[in-house]
């Protein structure tokens, strides 16, 4: 009797188990970097550490021809489109590249480009809210991007910014659409597996699939599609609102030039952030009273919900942004 195709619950449990172990590996690697190099280096290189952790996890399992821990947990194996042979080394390599490496490359390319397009072309400083922890260093690629975006006209910048926004949001919506489609049809859970044609077969025999669970998954897929449509509408509305606010800000920019120069001189006397060791930008207070940059402390709290100085525990929503604080 030929092995049966893996059911959607088995595929989802395998993916969740893999995500659990990948998260543990990321946390351990990030903690080691933080202990050895400090908080500033951890903030600067945490994305690269996460990438290396994912590549190591899939390199020791999928690339090596073994089951991942999640696949082993539910007893399923990967097969190529023939459903007879396991995927070749090339196909597995493409799978890991699409699943782990490509999202990192897209994020590293599109996010800095969006920040440069949002930046004031006259002063070269990004607008409020567009800074990130990794955006303070000026790498060669970032300088090249800044040089070429500076030569664009205002109309070209708006058009390119709109295209970047559509691409970033489109990729996120495509991922959500793909998951909803999986709930309905139950074949490919990850987009990378659809592109490479890799599916799952069940190794051990299990009782028949519950039809009620299958109907529930299809209903969940329909609800996910409706939620996706609503989210896309809200994101488009928010983008237009931000574009309108940015246009108004630039129209009134010249009237407040003198005030801005005075504020810049005042900012230059700001104390340092203890996380990045640079001038504190957008001061934010923790419940215990310590002050940090908004970008630094939010990035810190995304992995450790505690104060970096006194280690007092608190949820991220307790952070207090100090507007107009000097």
From Swiss-Prot:
Q: Name one GO cellular component term.
A: peroxisome
The cross-references to Gene3D superfamilies, in alphabetical order and at most eight, read: Zinc/RING finger domain, C3HC4 (zinc finger)
Q: Where would you find the membrane-spanning parts of this chain?
A: 8-37, 39-60, 90-122, 148-185, 217-236
Q: Tell me which UniProt keywords the record has, alphabetically.
A: Disease variant, Membrane, Metal-binding, Peroxisome, Peroxisome biogenesis, Peroxisome biogenesis disorder, Protein transport, Transferase, Transmembrane, Transmembrane helix, Transport, Ubl conjugation pathway, Zellweger syndrome, Zinc, Zinc-finger
Q: Give, as residue ranges, the zinc fingers classified RING-type.
A: 273-311
PROSITE patterns recorded: ZF_RING_1, ZF_RING_2
Residue numbers on the Cytoplasmic membrane side: 38, 123-147, 237-326
Membrane topology according to the record: Multi-pass membrane protein
Which sequence ranges are listed under topological domain Peroxisomal matrix?
A: 1-7, 61-89, 186-216
Q: What class of enzyme is it?
A: transferase
Pathway where this protein functions: Protein modification; protein ubiquitination
Where Zn(2+) 1 is bound, by residue? Answer: 273, 276, 293, 296
InterPro entries documented for this protein: PEX2/10 (IPR025654), Pex_N (IPR006845), Znf_RING (IPR001841), Znf_RING/FYVE/PHD (IPR013083), Znf_RING_CS (IPR017907)
Reactions accelerated catalytically: S-ubiquitinyl-[E2 ubiquitin-conjugating enzyme]-L-cysteine + [acceptor protein]-L-lysine = [E2 ubiquitin-conjugating enzyme]-L-cysteine + N(6)-ubiquitinyl-[acceptor protein]-L-lysine
Briefly describe activity regulation: The E3 ubiquitin-protein ligase activity is stimulated by PEX12.
Tell me which EC number(s) this protein carries. Answer: 2.3.2.27
Q: Which residues bind Zn(2+) 2?
A: 288, 290, 307, 310
MF terms from GO for this chain are: protein transmembrane transporter activity; ubiquitin protein ligase activity; zinc ion binding
Which GO BP terms sit in this record?
cellular response to reactive oxygen species; peroxisome organization; proteasome-mediated ubiquitin-dependent protein catabolic process; protein import into peroxisome matrix; protein import into peroxisome matrix, receptor recycling; protein import into peroxisome matrix, substrate release; protein polyubiquitination; protein quality control for misfolded or incompletely synthesized proteins
Q: Which disease is it linked to?
A: Peroxisome biogenesis disorder complementation group 7: A peroxisomal disorder arising from a failure of protein import into the peroxisomal membrane or matrix. The peroxisome biogenesis disorders (PBD group) are genetically heterogeneous with at least 14 distinct genetic groups as concluded from complementation studies. Include disorders are: Zellweger syndrome (ZWS), neonatal adrenoleukodystrophy (NALD), infantile Refsum disease (IRD), and classical rhizomelic chondrodysplasia punctata (RCDP). Peroxisome biogenesis disorder 6A: A fatal peroxisome biogenesis disorder belonging to the Zellweger disease spectrum and clinically characterized by severe neurologic dysfunction with profound psychomotor retardation, severe hypotonia and neonatal seizures, craniofacial abnormalities, liver dysfunction, and biochemically by the absence of peroxisomes. Additional features include cardiovascular and skeletal defects, renal cysts, ocular abnormalities, and hearing impairment.
The role this protein plays is: E3 ubiquitin-protein ligase component of a retrotranslocation channel required for peroxisome organization by mediating export of the PEX5 receptor from peroxisomes to the cytosol, thereby promoting PEX5 recycling. The retrotranslocation channel is composed of PEX2, PEX10 and PEX12; each subunit contributing transmembrane segments that coassemble into an open channel that specifically allows the passage of PEX5 through the peroxisomal membrane. PEX10 also regulates PEX5 recycling by acting as a E3 ubiquitin-protein ligase.
According to the record's subunit comment, the protein's assembly and interactions are: Component of the PEX2-PEX10-PEX12 retrotranslocation channel, composed of PEX2, PEX10 and PEX12. Interacts with PEX19.
How does the record comment on the protein's domains? The three subunits of the retrotranslocation channel (PEX2, PEX10 and PEX12) coassemble in the membrane into a channel with an open 10 Angstrom pore. The RING-type zinc-fingers that catalyze PEX5 receptor ubiquitination are positioned above the pore on the cytosolic side of the complex.
Q: Which family does it belong to?
A: Belongs to the pex2/pex10/pex12 family.
Q: What is this protein called?
A: Peroxisome biogenesis factor 10
Q: Which organism is it from?
A: Homo sapiens
């Amino acid at each position: 009797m030929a092995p049966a195709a893996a059911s959607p619950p088995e595929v989802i449990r395998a993916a969740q188990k893999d995500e659990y172990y990948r998260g543990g590996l990321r946390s351990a690697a990030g903690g080691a970097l933080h202990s050895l190099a400090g908080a500033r280096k951890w903030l600067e290189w945490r994305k690269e550490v996460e990438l290396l952790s994912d590549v190591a996890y899939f390199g020791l399992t999928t690339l090596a021809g073994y089951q991942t821990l999640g696949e082993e947990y539910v007893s399923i194996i990967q097969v190529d489109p023939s459903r007879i042979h396991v995927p070749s080394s090339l196909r597995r390599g493409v799978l890991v590249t699409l699943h782990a490496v490509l999202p990192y490359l897209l994020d590293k390319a599109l996010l800095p480009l969006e920040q440069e397009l949002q930046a004031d072309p006259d002063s070269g400083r990004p607008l409020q809210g567009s800074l990130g922890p990794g955006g303070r260093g000026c790498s060669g690629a970032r300088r090249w991007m800044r040089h070429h975006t500076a030569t664009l006209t205002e109309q070209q910048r708006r058009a390119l910014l709109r295209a970047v926004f559509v691409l970033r949001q489109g990729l996120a919506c495509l991922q959500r659409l793909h998951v909803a489609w999986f709930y309905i049809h139950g074949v490919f859970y990850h987009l990378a597996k659809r592109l490479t044609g890799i599916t799952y077969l069940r190794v051990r025999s299990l009782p028949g699939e519950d039809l009620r669970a299958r109907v529930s998954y299809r209903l969940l897929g329909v609800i996910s599609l409706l939620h996706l449509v609503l989210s896309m509408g809200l994101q488009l509305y928010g983008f237009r609102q931000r574009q309108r606010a940015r246009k108004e800000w630039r129209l009134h920019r010249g009237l407040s030039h003198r005030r801005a120069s005075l504020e810049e001189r005042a900012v230059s006397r700001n104390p340092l952030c203890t996380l990045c060791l640079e001038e504190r930008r957008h001061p934010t207070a923790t419940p215990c009273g310590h002050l940090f940059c908004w970008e630094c402390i939010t990035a810190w709290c995304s992995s450790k919900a505690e104060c970096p100085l006194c280690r007092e525990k608190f949820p991220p929503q307790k952070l207090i942004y100090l507007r107009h604080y000097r």
